[in-house]
């Protein structure tokens, strides 16, 4: 069984949304502020899905393909 990655990185946001990696970094900062997280804490796929409105299944399918 292959384990799916739990964290989202700017490059993932770039591939999922088609936007720039810089946009991905900015969005991660916004998500951290939204969930009141510290700069050293990771953003999970569930948090990204909730914030962006993208279905979690789409995100998990992408993460399975790239893992």
Segments and roles (model prediction):
Residues 4-19:
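Polyanion-binding surface elements
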